[in-house]
Amino acid sequence: GEIRDIETAEIAVQASLTGHLVLSALHTNTAIGAVTRLQDMGVEPFLLSSSLLGVMAQRLIRLLCMDCREAYAPSSLECELLNLTDTSDPVLYRAVGCSSCNETGYRGRTGIYELIEIDETLREMIHDGASEQAMLAQARKNYQGIDADGRRRIIAGETCIEEVLR
């Protein structure tokens, strides 16, 4: 289930500390934001640092309709946004609309994900009450954010920039 209050959070932490694998949901914008949310609920940092193995963020995006997506040469701003500087002639795709997709330009959905394993460094940072920004900077040394997964889907032609940014 979802962790919405301190009582549920404490039950989840206690279950984790006694050897149970606990999977739960929290509403946050980033994976590391789950740590901050649990702290804000009142979970003690020393308990949190001992009980977390990893945190994950996910978001649904629409997939471009493969029957009508339109290839185009991205602008310099789009190339910069996607870090496509090493590609000579990059191609991206945009939604158009056809009878197959009810004129929306999209057919289906998929998830984009971010997974952060709580390593010893992050565990110490959580225990010491480090800021979300500091923990995020540390996590980015080893793990890519949800935006990197979105970028991969854009470059593969599965979705468009607008969909990942919305």
Segment roles from a protein language model:
Residues 1-166:
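Short, flexible helix-loop junctions that flank or precede catalytic/ligand sites
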